[in-house]
Amino acid sequence: MPMQGAQRRLLGSLNSIPTATPNLGLAANHTGAPCLEVSIPDWLFLSLGLVSLVQNVLVVAAIAKNRNLHSPMYCFICCLALSDLLVSGSNMLETAVILMLEAGALATRASVVQQLQNTIDVLTCSSMLCSLCFLGAIALDRYVSIFYALRYHSIVTLPRARRAIAATWVASVLSSTLFIAYCDHAAVLLCLVVFFLAMLVLMAVLYVHMLARACQHAQGITRLHKRQLPAHQGFGLRGAATLTILLGIFFLCWGPFFLHLMLVVLCPQHLTCSCIFKNFKVFLTLIICNTIIDPLIYAFRSQELCRTLKEVLLCSW
């Protein structure tokens, strides 16, 4: 979808609405009714992207450096970091190009801008799909490690993990290319929304089942040592809180973006929906925030990875 004016984002395939005006306040929609419009300054957007970029580069470097981390689980974590890196990097590139075009520092033909837009769209969409896929893969890997502990190393082997990773990247790039090529079709956007909901349900079911098993295990230990029940209840509450935070962050960071896509299909001309469309950059910013949070949840909690990360940082100095 071609750009119309300097205020259009390059990510026009998934958003045909102008970006927010440079303040937080009430803007008028087509009928003059107030419409809340939140602005994300470019410097803040680029800063968050840079933090995400640095974090995820460090995760990839640490896993690549330490052979002890070349297991299927860490391969999935590495690919999650790589896809998050591409999500933040592609959005930073898009913002930088827009700023240069607006400032007149980059002069090029409309056809070149269109090709660049399509390339960034495919890169962004494929990296987002990969990020969601690897979040699901990490949940599935943990599920197998708990419920099939004795057979885990025969089920989740490194060759199988590598084949699954390669298939995920190829499928994401191919599907993203098709999505961008046929972005005007409602079925394409609905497919993306359904995919997000499927990943959300998959993660919720797996993690809830793991929490239930962990509570049963804690209850068994409590009975074995004849300890009081509140200790088990406390464990259950902590586990439920952790699960709520994990799934809550995922839903809060990704949900608004896919809600935007769903509303584009359901009510593209509705006045209330048009107000939501104006905050598209906020939804992208939430996804960037998720790429910052992912390493904190999945990578930096590993002592082995943190030790390797310190070595990487010391070597870089």
Curated annotation (Swiss-Prot):
Its main location: membrane. This is Melanocyte-stimulating hormone receptor. GO terms for biological process: adenylate cyclase-activating G protein-coupled receptor signaling pathway. Glycans are attached at residue 29. Changing residue 140 to V: In strain: Isolate 3. Changing residue 153 to R: In strain: Isolate 3. PANTHER family: G-PROTEIN COUPLED RECEPTOR. Keywords: Cell membrane, G-protein coupled receptor, Glycoprotein, Lipoprotein, Membrane, Palmitate, Receptor, Transducer, Transmembrane, Transmembrane helix.
